Structure formats: structure tokens, C-alpha cells
Amino acid sequence: MTSPFLGRKMTAVAVAVACTTGLLASCSSSGTAASGNNGIAIIQTQQGSTANDIFPIVSGPQITPYNQQDFQWLMYRPLLWYGGQPGNEFGLYNQISLADAPVYSDNDTVITITMKKYYWSDGTPVTARDVTFFFNLLEANKNYWGYYTPGEFPDNVKSMQAVNAQTLRITLTRSYAPQWYSTNELSDLIPLPQHAWDKTSATASPGNYDETHDGAVAVFNYLLSQAHSVNTYSSNPLWQVVDGPFRLKSYSTRGDIDLVPNPHYSGTPKPQLKELVERPFTSLTAEFDALLANTGLTTGIVPSEDTSQIPALKAEGYTVFNTPSYGFNYIVINFNSPNAGYLFRQLYIRQALQHLVNQPQDVQYGYHGNATPSYGPVPLAPPSPYTTQYERSNPYPYSVSTAESLLTAHGWKVTPGGTDTCTSPGTGPDDCGAGIPAGKTLTLKILYDPYDTGYTIMMDNFQSAAHSAGISVQLSQGQFNQITAVTGVCSMGSKACDWDGVMYGGSTMGVYPTGNGFFNTNANGQGNYSSPEADTLINDTEYQPGTSYFYQYENYIAQQLPMIWMPWEQTGIDNVVASNLRGFTADEENPFNDTFPENWSFGK
């Protein structure tokens, strides 16, 4: 389930105690973490980063942890869940998957999947037909889907057949490496309640409309229209038919979301919470202040600038957990920007920009050591079998003088503290490059999310270093949902492409961290980067087993810089959990930022 926006999951699990004045009313501090509760757990979210899409076939900007891990996947479980199982963090999480492990045959062109016995909340069995329903809707509306890459899923499926209620057979257009296909393609399958959703209007009776292209389009458009009516989420009967551990009780556009256990959940364990509540905070500082004041939150996030207060939290009875999250951070640069697209298409400019990121300094002072450098497309922590020595070596270390030399060698008049200008237009080895006219200035506009103080420090440092090299970086701030909304595939000259760069916090990678969906042509949300060589190398990681092809891809992307690498804040290191929260192991040890509240309970 690798995704451009499944990255910075700045939610914290926060468990509320029942105070007589309300869920978040002030409670007196007793020197221990809040221990009384009424079975209500609160997940803290950031205003502007809350769930705003309930339909599991999501567009690119809607692929966020707030929509998926913290919302949709609690109600609509993926068929196969990869990653996050304690002790087997990079494998199939069999306990919460709705099917057994896929079986490959016929030279890895045929996949057979056996469904487990799960039921929808209305008592109807979850069957292979619910999977083909999802596939039919997706195939007919694939250009809407945020995970779609031409030639990949669903294009690489020749047929998908419900052999019987419990057996799904998928025939592929060619052989694929099973590890890649299972973790990056099959993990996208989400059974949908065909018996309740296969209709074209609120008054129509469910049928088999999805089995024709036009019918699938009509059903999809109806469901999408209902999903766009966010004010009706809790009252619309469509969204009450779920197979996950929770169902929706109430929803507000401000970000207040209440979920309650699905009493018909077929998986194990059964939810023991009375209610799961999501409440937005204006900032991490506001959340942390509430935590320190013991106002009802018994778990939360420690902002990077407040890590010195961890001993005080421990004295209050909290436990700190420190599992690294498996991701990397970056500035998305827009190769089709009317202002900067031709600049970004020059490797030497991308190299110069990367040399202006002082990652060791940002890790130490911006995040107080609570971050990992990003040097390429594979996370450096936790350790995995996919990281090469080349990427670990930091190919572009911080050096303002190296950045200046690169620009000078390619036809730029470098003006430290001023603004560099192109004085040698053209395509020769000493020229500025194609599309860059004489007099063009190195001026970039970058939008970023200031949710964590560390982000602002990091971006200010980058701006200052760029200024030293004569590059004008103009920074502006925006909320997470606002930023991700502007980063889709676009054409140069279109209004949708009128942005230079954004930084929203990075991405959590999947268990097999290939570049599909990130660095191949037409990848959603990643700045319109396109390289035939990258496409070939990414395809090789999909078709060929083993790691040698993967290492070639990784080294190429680390060298080519389709984005500007930035430090990845380790959100797992700065979390605290009250001692009376049970069943938190899967969340605590999960490097992929998943949430498993069906395991939670309260105890002494």
C-alpha cells in the first residue's frame, strides 16, 4: 500500500478519561498518567489534516493516513494486510487479513486467493464477489484512483473471477515477482459490500450493474456523490454496512469523528473499547499542553522541541516508546511548473539544491536527534534488506560552495546573498540548459506544513543556505490537506501546475519499498517527474525476483534526485502511552504508522 501521502502520520493515540465535565475537560493531576476511563479512546489529529473521505476508492489527494489508517481501514479492511505484525513487521499480517496468503501458479501469472469467513455488519458474508465488485468499479474509473499508474494495476489484470463465494482467481497479463505483486498490488484490494452498494441511485435496488463498463461508471458516480456529501456520513445507510472492527457513529467537517465497535466484526480480537474518538488540535503544542496538564489525554505526541520534558511525562506515569517509522521526507519539486519546471529538469540544479540541505544539523537542532536523514528512495531506519551502501553514504553532503560551483560551471552568474541569473543560455555542457533563457533567475516558491516546529526550522535553514548561494527560496505555509491537494499530475501551462515545490512531511513506505507510484511516469502527487530509465528500473523490480534489480533502481533514484531529500522525523520515538492502556504492542512496534484500536483495552 505504498502511497505518496501515507507519509507523515502526525496523529497520536490519545486515550481519554471520563471527567464529569466532558471528554476533554480539565481533570486534577494526581502525579500519575490518567488512569480512570470509561472505555473511550481519543485519537488526536491536526486541524486541516482530518479524515474527509469515506469511500475506499480514493483520489490522489485523499490518500492520507487520516483518511485510510485512522478512518476507512477501521471500517473497510483490505483483503490482504502487509506489514505491522509484531515479530513479522515486513510480512503478511495474517490475523487481520480477510483472506489467506495468495498462491501463485502458471509461471506466476495466475493467483488464487481463498477468503476467510467474514461477515458484513448486516450479516451478509464477505465473498469473492465483493472483491470483483471493487475491481470492476476501479477498472472502469481507474483515472480517478490515486494509486493508478498506467500499465500497472488494474491494467495488468487479464481477468478477475469469483470462482465461488470463497475463491478468487486472478489472471495476470504477464509474470510478476510474487513479493512485489502481493505487497504492492494485491494489498490495494478492498472488498466492498456489493449486495448493498451495487446501485446507481438512492432509490434503486442493488443489482449487478458493475459487470458492465457503463454500469460500473454509474455505480461509481453514485457512490462518489454520496462520499462528497460529508455532512451525511453518519446518517447515510451506505456507510453503515462495514466489515471492519468499527462503524461510524458521528462525523463533523471540523474533524470530530466518533466510531463505535462493529458488534458483528468477524475478526479477532473483538473491539473492547466503548468508543473511538478523533478530535482535532490546532497544533502539536496545544496537544502537548493538554497532555502535561493531565486534562484527559493519556497518550500523545511529544513535539521535537519538547523532548527535554520526557522525564516529566515519565514521572506522571507515562511510558515512552521508540520504534522508528519506515519512511523518508522530501520537498516535492514540480517538473512542469511554469516558473521552475525547466530549472528542475536540469540534474545539476537538483544537485545544487540537495547540497544546500544540512541534514545532520536539521536532525540535531530541528528535531533534537529525533529524526533520520533521507538520502534516497529507501528509508534508512529501521534496518531492512533493501538499503544500499551508495544511498547510506550520503551522495550529496551539505556544501554551499559545491552548490555554487555547480551553478557557475553551467552558465550562471552566482551572487551570494543576491539572486543568481543565467548568463549562458543553451544546451551545451557549460550552458544553463534547455528552456532556460538568458536573465532567468533562480527563484523558487515552496509551500510547506508548519505543524511541527522542526519543519519550520528545517525549511528556514534550507532558505538561508540557498540565499547564501544566490538562490531565492520564498516560503509560505499551508495545512496538510491544502498542500496535498495541489500536487497531482498536471501539464505545464495549466492552472493546476502553478506551483514550484511543496513539503508536507514525507511518506511511509510499504514492506517492499519500490518506486512505483513515486518515481515512475505519471505517478500521482510526486511533481510530474518522468524518466524512461527510472521506468525501466522500476519495472525490473516488479518483474524480476531478488534484490540486484532493486539495488540498481535505488542507486539511480538516489543519484538522480527526483525530489529534494529532507530529514524524516521519527514519529515513533516521541510518543507516550499511559500504563493502563493494554493491547498497544502492534501500534507501538509498527514501523508503518498503522493503527489497531481493536486490540486496545483498559486495565490496571
Tell me what each language-model feature is.
Residues Q44-D106, N136, V241:
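N-terminal lobe/hinge region of extracytoplasmic solute-binding protein
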Residues Y104, T109, Q351, V363, ...:
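Extracytoplasmic/peripheral linker and loop segments enriched in polar/acidic and small residues
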Residues D100-W145, V163, R169-T171, E287-A293, ...:
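Aromatic- and charge-enriched surface segment that lines or borders ligand/interaction sites
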Residues L138-Y148, S159-A162, K249-H264, V277-G341, ...:
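Extracellular/periplasmic solute-recognition and catalytic clefts
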Residues F55, L343-S384, N394-H410, M458, ...:
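Periplasmic-binding protein-like
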Residues S252-G255, P385, S393, K413-G505:
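Ligand/substrate-recognition segments at binding pockets and active sites
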